[in-house]
Every structure is written in C-alpha cells, then in structure tokens.
Amino acid sequence: MNQNLLSQYGTPVERVEKGLQALREGRGILVTDNESRENEGDLIFSAEKLSDEQMAMMIRECSGIVCLCLTDEKTEQLGLPMMVESNSSRYQTGFTVTIEAAEGVTTGVSAADRVTTVKAAIADGAKPADLHRPGHVFPLRAREGGVLEREGHTEATVDMMTLAGLNPCGVLCELTNPDGTMARLPEIVEFGQKHDMPVLTVDDIINYRIQLAKKAS
C-alpha cells in the first residue's frame, strides 16, 4: 500500500475518524484492502442516509453490483439464506440470495428502486415478506467479529457504520475506471479528491478497533 498517497488524509487513526465523520454527514467513503488481497477500493455509503443520487453514482462509477452489508442479526431477521450452501469463493464473501422490495418498485433495477429495496431491508421492523427474491440488490452477511475476524470490505462497512453510531448496515460497490478495469490506489485517491470523500484502508479500521479495545480494557 502506497502510504504516500494516503498521507494527505492523515494518520491511520485520523483517516478512520474522517471517514466516520463523512458517514455521519451522509457522504461517501472509499475503503481499500491490501494489495495482496483483492487490491480494490470500494465506494461505501450509509444505508440509512443513502440517496437516489448516491445510488446512481455507484451504478455509474462502479461495477454495478451494488451490495447491502448486513449484520448476522439483520440477515436472520430478514430470513435470507446464503446464495450457496458451500461457499468456494476465494475470499469467502458472504452473499445471500438477492432481494427486491415487495412494494414501491417497478423493475427494481433503477437507482430509486434499489434505494427503496435497501430502505425496506434495513427498516427496524423489516420482515421476510417485505422483500422478494431474487432481485437487483446483493446482500452480504458480515462476520460477527467484523474486520478482526475477516479483513473484508463487508466487515469494514458494518464496522464503520457501527463506529459512526449509525444503523450498522451500509452499501458498497467496487470502484472501476472508465474503461471497465478495477481502480487501484492512484485512481481511488483521485476519485476521493474529486468527490470530497475520505480514503482509508481495512488495516486502518483493524488498528482503530484494536486501539479502542485496549483503551476499554
């Protein structure tokens, strides 16, 4: 990871805190993982504050596979089974079956329809009947231990929402270049500068959580 590119966002702790503040303000953040892992950056928004414009940005600027990161508890509440019984994906990404809001959508694929689906899923009293399956939103089940258990964007998203004091659910999508290739750190930082979004790493969140745990002990 090129720390020189990230240094403009401060120390690892400062990067996390800037990210938390951005989420509280309803802005997006960009989270990168290790070069030895996926070596990608995800555009992440709070699910509870998500707007149609932000969803449109994710569809336009990212891979198009917009994912809704959920806690174990929320996944169980919604009765969402995993997409496959035996997960053979390289990083054990926790995809459940895809979803669509049962009411308030047309084809389900527009930015507004996908936001409606997200809001239906994260509602406090949401129940399985509120969602149809399959759909155009891809839920991801986060590991209970967060980034301390799995160093993934799913867990990073839920951890950041929790640390920010928001509904723990968030949406993410992998940032891509105009030619369809995956954005790497230089492009991720450039995108962050253009759209006033903090850039941080999964490692930053891991270290932040470890420091918080030490202070609490």
From Swiss-Prot:
SUPFAM superfamilies: YrdC/RibB (SSF55821). The keyword NAD does not apply. Homodimer. GO terms for cellular component: cytosol. Pathway: Cofactor biosynthesis; riboflavin biosynthesis; 2-hydroxy-3-oxobutyl phosphate from D-ribulose 5-phosphate: step 1/1. This is 3,4-dihydroxy-2-butanone 4-phosphate synthase. Its cofactor is Mg(2+); Mn(2+). The gene is ribB. The lineage of its organism: Bacteria, Pseudomonadati, Thermodesulfobacteriota, Desulfovibrionia, Desulfovibrionales. Coiled coil: none annotated. D-ribulose 5-phosphate binds at R37, E38, D42, R150, E151, G152, H153, T154, E174. Keywords: Lyase, Magnesium, Manganese, Metal-binding, Riboflavin biosynthesis. NCBIfam families: ribB. It catalyses: D-ribulose 5-phosphate = (2S)-2-hydroxy-3-oxobutyl phosphate + formate + H(+). It comes from Maridesulfovibrio salexigens (strain ATCC 14822 / DSM 2638 / NCIMB 8403 / VKM B-1763) (Desulfovibrio salexigens). One of its GO terms (molecular function) is 3,4-dihydroxy-2-butanone-4-phosphate synthase activity. Catalyzes the conversion of D-ribulose 5-phosphate to formate and 3,4-dihydroxy-2-butanone 4-phosphate.
